[in-house]
From Swiss-Prot:
Its job: Effector that acts as a broad suppressor of cell death to interrupt plant immunity. Inhibits cell death induced by cell death-inducing proteins, including the PAMP elicitor INF1 from P.infestans.
Family statement: Belongs to the RxLR effector family.
Subcellular location(s) per record: Secreted; Host cytoplasm; Host nucleus
Induction: Expression is up-regulated at the earlier infection stages.
Protein name per the record: Secreted RxLR effector protein 27
Chief subcellular location: secreted
Annotated Pfam families: ABC1 (PF03109)
CC annotations in GO: extracellular region; host cell cytoplasm; host cell nucleus
Domain of life: Eukaryota
Intrachain S-S bonds: none
Record comment regarding domains: The RxLR-dEER motif acts to carry the protein into the host cell cytoplasm through binding to cell surface phosphatidylinositol-3-phosphate.
Organism (species): Plasmopara viticola (Downy mildew of grapevine)
Length: 235
C-alpha cells in the first residue's frame, strides 16, 4: 500500500511539475505576476517573523524599545528596497512614492527607499525590440539606423534609448515596459492586500491612507504614457 501510494504521489508531483512548467512557458506574463506576488508574500512573512522575535518580551516602556524599533525599521526598509527593485515596474514606482512621505513614515524608510529614485531595473533589449515592433508594426531595425541597446535612463515604468531614425535624425526613444497595464491590475491588488495585512498584524500602523494617493498617481502616469505617447516618445 505504501509503495502504491508513493508511486501515485510521485506521478502526481511529476504531472504537476510538467503542468506548472507548461503554464509558465505558455503564459510568461502570468508567471511573472505570480513570482512578484510570491516575493511580496515572502517579504511579508519575513517582516512579521522579525518583528515577533525582535520584540519578544519587550514592552513600549522598555528603555531599549526605541533603539530596537529603529533597527527593525531599517531592516524592513532594506527588505522593501530589495523587493521594489527586484519586482521592478509598479513596485519601483510604489517605493519611490513611499520615499516622498516624509511627514508620515519613519526616516529609515524614506531615506532607504529614496535610492529607488536613481535605481530602476531596466528591461532587456529583446523586450525593448518586441515593444517597438508591436507598436510600429515592422522590424525595429527598419525603423532606426542606430539604436543603443543600453538605456541612457531607466525609470519605474519606462526607459529611454538614444537612436537615429531611418532619415538620419538623432533622437531619444522612450519605451514603456511591456505588458505594463496587464500586470498593473494584479500588482495593485497585491499591494493593497499588503497594506491590509500590515494593518491587521500591526494595528498601530496605519498605511491604507497611502494607497489611494499611490493608485491615483500610478494610473495618471500610465494613462498619460499610453494616450500621449503610445509607448514611444520621440524627442
Amino acid at each position: 500500500m505504501t509503495n502504491l501510494f508513493t508511486r501515485h504521489t510521485r506521478r502526481s508531483l511529476t504531472a504537476l511539475a510538467l503542468l506548472s512548467g507548461g503554464v509558465y512557458a505558455a503564459d510568461e506574463v502570468n508567471a511573472k505576476i505570480l513570482s512578484r506576488s510570491l516575493r511580496v508574500f515572502v517579504t511579508g512573512g519575513q517582516v512579521l517573523w522579525d518583528y515577533r522575535i525582535h520584540f519578544k518580551g519587550i514592552e513600549r516602556d522598555h528603555p531599549d524599545y526605541h533603539s530596537k524599533l529603529q533597527s527593525l525599521n531599517q531592516r524592513i526598509a532594506h527588505r522593501l528596497l530589495y523587493l521594489c527593485f527586484e519586482n521592478g515596474g509598479i513596485y519601483t514606482k510604489f517605493g519611490q512614492q513611499l520615499a516622498t512621505f516624509n511627514h508620515g513614515l519613519p526616516r529609515e524608510y524614506t531615506m532607504t527607499l529614496a535610492q529607488l529614485q536613481d535605481q530602476a531595473k531596466p528591461v532587456s533589449f529583446d523586450k525593448v525590440k518586441q515593444t517597438i515592433e508591436a507598436e510600429m508594426g515592422r522590424p525595429w531595425n527598419e525603423c532606426y539606423k542606430e539604436f543603443d541597446q543600453t538605456p541612457i535612463a531607466s525609470a519605474s515604468l519606462a526607459q529611454v534609448h538614444h537612436a537615429v531614425d531611418a532619415l538620419g535624425r538623432e533622437m531619444a526613444v522612450k519605451v514603456q515596459y511591456p505588458h505594463l497595464e496587464l500586470q498593473m491590475k494584479a500588482d495593485i491588488r497585491v499591494i493593497k492586500w499588503a497594506f491590509q495585512f500590515t494593518e491587521y498584524c500591526f494595528p498601530d500602523v496605519q498605511l491604507q491612507w497611502l494607497f489611494p494617493e499611490f493608485q491615483k498617481a500610478l494610473l495618471a502616469e500610465v494613462h498619460f504614457d499610453a494616450q500621449c505617447t503610445a509607448l514611444l516618445i520621440i524627442f
